[in-house]
């Protein structure tokens, strides 16, 4: 979804949210029951939050409101990957220190190390594209 947020393309954000929810629905969470009950319970709580925020994006029309739910998806996705011992392709946990104003930071998961800021993007009303690369890589998410 982050690339669609970079372009501030609400139709593409929603289309990607649908695909993301379908991907979530394909995850076999019951496999985690083989681990300790605590891992399953924590993972399920995080999973439900991710899905709920992704579904909320589908109900919105304002890109800034969508970005707030995207932020919540991201904030839950990162620990979810840690809980389930993610084994997929390398991804990056990135941060924008001014995603929602000078005092409000936000994070996201990216497939690329290069920062392409989904919160300020290419079409920000105030900054235009000048803040597209604003942010830092905070962590690398890779197979354990």
How should each PLM-predicted stretch be described?
Residues 1-144:
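Mature extracytoplasmic or organellar-lumen-exposed domains after removal of signal/transit peptides
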